[in-house]
Amino acid sequence: MNIKKLFKYEPIPNYEFNIQSTENASVQDLSTEKTDQKVYSSLQKNLEFAQSKYNFLINSDIIIRHFSIICKNKQYKAFLLYIDGMTDSVIVNQFVLHPLMLRNKNNTFDDSTNVQNIQKTQKTETTQNTQNIQKSQYTQNIQKSQNTKKVQNAQNNKNDTQKKYEDLSNYIYERLIPNNNISIQKQFDKIISDINSGNCALFVDTLNVVFDIDAKGFKQRSIDRPQIENVIKGPQEAFLENIRTNTSLLRRLTNNENLVIENVEVGEISKTKCALCYMQNIANGDLIAEAKYRLNNLSIDTLVSSGELEQLIQDGSSFGIPQVLSTERPDKCVKAVMQGRAVILVNGNPYALIIPSVMTDFLASPEDSNLNPLFANFLKFIRLLAFLITLLLPGMYIAVTNFHQELFPTELLFSILVARENVPFPIIFELLLMEISFELIREGGLRTPSAIGSTLGIVGALILGDAAVAANIVSPILIIVVAITGLSSFVIPNFSFGFHLRVFRFAFTILGYIAGFLGIGLGIYVYMVLLCSIKSFGVAYLSPISPNISGFSLKYFVPPFWKQEYRNDFLAPKKQVSQSKFSMVWKKENSNGKNQ
């Protein structure tokens, strides 16, 4: 034993791992390779293609179930391909494998049961003729002719049935698989996409087709209340992550056969299913054609959420001003399609996109149509006031304080000067500090668990504001300005539109600090020019106020429901009239009856 090695220090080698660049590596990606490969008639070739497509040797959730089908004393090998967790095992076992492997004796491929039924029918008719032999000769001749026709029809039906089921694929499709949604595919691209969505595929030897069987059964949450767009008076349903559940909600509320739901796949790798929903007899054809064109011409690998799709289909960035309305409420989407708009649903996302959208849509609440017009218009006025306060109040305050002190009453001006006497920082620093602090409290309240989020926001704002005033960092009047601005931002119904106002507020604050009312006026001019230049799917963003004011247009304030006789003309719908001028017919009938 070497004593030196025993006491010798040997440092532990550092383990290092670096990712090497594979940009120029020539690796075949089967998931994005677009081929028109048709299904082989050889079961072994189909099996090898499916295994290579899904990396079967390393994928643990890909299930391939081998079995045999016996038809007309012949044994046909087959296998079922599906993804574990995406399909319903009850459907696969009882309605796919059970009838195929343990088929009923009545489902014979040579259709011998029909022959037996025909023979029984002939025997019954012969017995009846024997019992009625005492009838007149005329009646017997009629019965004989009828019996002859029945036998001929039965024989013809037998021949048609035998001819029909000479094809094994038709026999399996119509006799062996009791499923309400099954199709026959001849190419791999379609069947692979459906398997990824939860279907199962049946491959049978000697057949160059594959049976696409709907067996979806993945878990999903139940229909719940809206999380963001809550209303006191109105429906309490919200969209889910399953696109078919969402389309069924639209179909149930619309209750009309003119509702068209077209499927579109987006993403070369993810192949995310999207649904374009519109009323065929109302929506403008050019709008629908443009929506299809944009959806079908997206060259991306993956699409996960409706927020990503919103960025891809809107006309331009326009400094963050939202151009597509996002909602989680089915009733809001139904009202949109009834006006002539289109709704886009994305699989895996509980939010729908409404196109086109104008500025007034982002200031509207789902509750407006459910309230009395007087109350609804009062709330809409409050939202309009909150819009102006959120955008301009901090900038107006800093402009008046620095440049236009004469606008303040003398007593109020003295109070502001006394409050700011001990503050060592310029007013722009105070304002930006409190604005950023308020945004931090807001984001912290959103990201923390809901049980303590609201408490954190209230306590944090109180402690921070009181400590800032006590330390002479900010003045009390500034705390009031920031608080009113923050409360006004919460009144905006749409989160995206409210966020854009919060960002633009900083720009108006800086302009007010630099040039006072002149800077704010210049900012308003640029902001209005920007709004006027925006279009959402060919519709002016400031419609119905600009560029054309029409008598048919529904303005910002909501008229009574019985006065909403026309749809928005800026949408150019096929059907302009939405209801009769005398929608309350009962009033007219009662008045006529009284006059008589």
Each language-model region and where it sits:
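Hydrophobic alpha-helical segments embedded in or immediately adjacent to the lipid bilayer
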Residues: F387-L407
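Generic detector of multi-pass transmembrane helix bundles and their immediately adjacent loops
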Residues: M396-A399, P409-Q596
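Short, contiguous, pocket-lining structural segments
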Residues: P373, N377, H404, F408, ...
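Membrane-embedded alpha-helical signal segments
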Residues: M1-L392, T410, L530-Q596
